[in-house]
Amino acid sequence: MTTYSSREEIDEQYRWDLSSIFESDEAFLAALEEAKKLPPRFASFQGKISASAAELLAYLKLDDEAGLILTKLANYAERKSDEDTRESRYQDYSSQVMTLWVSLSSASSWFTSELLSLSEQEMEGFYSQEPELELYRRCLDVIFSRREHVLSPAEEKLLAAAGDMANQPDNIFSLLNDADLTFPDAHDAEGAAHPVTHGSYIPLMMSADRTLRESAYESLYSSYRQFRNTFAATLGAQNKQLKFFAEARRYESALEAALSANEVPTQVYTNLIETVHNNMDAMYKYVALRKELLDVDELRFSDLYVPIVDDVELTFTYEEACDIILEALRPMGENYLALVRRSLSERWIDVYETPGKRSGAYSAGGYGMHPVILLNFQGKLDDVFTLIHEMGHSIHTYLSCANQPVCYSDYVIFVAEVASTCNEALLTRYLLDHAKNERERAYFLNHFLEQFRATLYRQTMFAEFELKVAELTAQGAGITADALCGIYKELNAQYFGDGIALDENIALEWARIPHFYYRFYVYQYATGFAAAIALSQRILDLGEQGREDYLGFLKGGSSKPPIDLLRGAGVNMLSPEPVEDALKLFDEMVDEMAEACRKLKAEKH
């Protein structure tokens, strides 16, 4: 893969076009100056929206206007900064936008309390007086549904002031984990040293050299063991602040407080855990297959990342990757494909790595601009999956914005991962159907099974750990390193079964997971994955009906609660069925993998 020393070396077609946001820095700065006039306009409505339907409507229209311009300002500043993170000008632009966002939040902090001073009867009167308010009924209903959890203005101000303090467990964890923690070198079978970092750990764990894998595994956890009590204190503090805010807002639990923000019933969370518990056999079968294929006497946690199909070197040019995703997405229909082609021809995508460019990949966008995708394309299979994944987010954003008014154009995280993972599921099916030989097919199966294990099983285990720690905190129990290690080790025993050797290192894994500071976030990876598998299967099985239902979901934005949007697409996340169906597919794929590997073994002999 060609390496580039600057963006100017890259052909324009591989660099994103941000002109749909702002034509130039000058246009951005002019819009920013104009937007700085917004906070006083918000503040001027205080005391008026509860007295007049016309004033409430004017406020909501102003809120739409502000959301539009702030989204464009933030996108331009952040996208330009990500082109070269060393460029201080765009860091300054981002900082100015964030400052403005904080000012706007402060200038409008009174809104919810004042709105909730209106009775249901008064609100209905407002709808009669100003028919245009009907557009905002769902937005307002969501706020009214949380009436019992909103406090007095003085209490709200106090909770807001505590917000920065509540973020400190995450901040301390990040500094300890990312800045202060170092790891001893790992050594391979020849005795050569290999540096261990957060970035190098997984590549080392994928090495065919078992000595190196075990050394890297021991290296990583030796450092976490040294600071286990500090990590326990940060996680304990995180759970205490969640408990404090949940109780202050009169929620029954920290879980309910977190999920209510996305209108997701706690039943979805507990249902996920229960359904996975009832379908562990497929995971145990996969663990046994991995042990057999690696030909080891004892499967260890240091053996989980090494590929079980070797000798497959797949590389792709960017053009080949684009051709593959267009073919894989053919079941989505011509309208969807036309948008994908537009994204490729109209420069929505920033393709190649350059010095200073932000690492990783993402899709970003919003009302009034086309979405954009950042890649660091290296030509590996994972890069093809990344492209189709981010394309799923971008088309979701485009369709939501094209079919909803500003106030409903965004969508919550609970449904976001569905759109991206559905695309990945279609790519997996396409690759399996077009594998050139049995070895390539086994390689694709291995890729899918690992993705499945890491997403549905692993994230559900994480979700269960979060819930158990929250329940301990609610009981007033001490959150000690020993208690956390005990819970985590027991969960690993349950999720992996007898087919793997439990050790004291894996009991410490909780200490290195940043998502445990994200407030009951990880379950959405698992539910999103299950929903995506179900929807991709519907699209393949039902053809046009499945496709139209799915496109309706993508166009829905936040016009309905996420559970209702998914139900409209044909998936009921309140039932165990989507998770059960996904786990059934995993079970079938494990059998396919075993059969493919048996054929490969027979070919060798």
Range-by-range predicted roles:
Residues 1-311, 596, 601:
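A well-structured
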Residues 372-376, 403-413, 442-451, 470-472, ...:
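Short beta-alpha connecting loops at secondary-structure transitions
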Residues 385, 397-421:
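Post-HEXXH active-site segment of zinc metalloproteases
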